[in-house]
Amino acid sequence: LRVIHTPGHSAGHIALFAERQGVLFAGDTCANMFGLGPSIMYEDAAEGMGSLARLATLDFEAVCFGHGRAITRDAAGRFRRRWAGGI
């Protein structure tokens, strides 16, 4: 299990990446409540967007969130399309 520092929601926020299983646990880095989007609350929005761009570089099959339904199909592709440019 790989621990990834993902500041933004909070300064000490982390995501967990189970590489062998292809699962990213994004926590509160982002949400999937009304479609894939950034977290509802960020202490630092710029840091949060940077964290999302970094997560978009990973290869995973599924992603789980602190809020909203998991994405189990094309999860990494959806992240890349949404945040690869840090947008």
Tell what function each PLM region has.
Residues 2-82:
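Metallo-beta-lactamase
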Residues 84-87:
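Acidic/His-rich, metal-assisted hydrolase cores and their charged scaffolds
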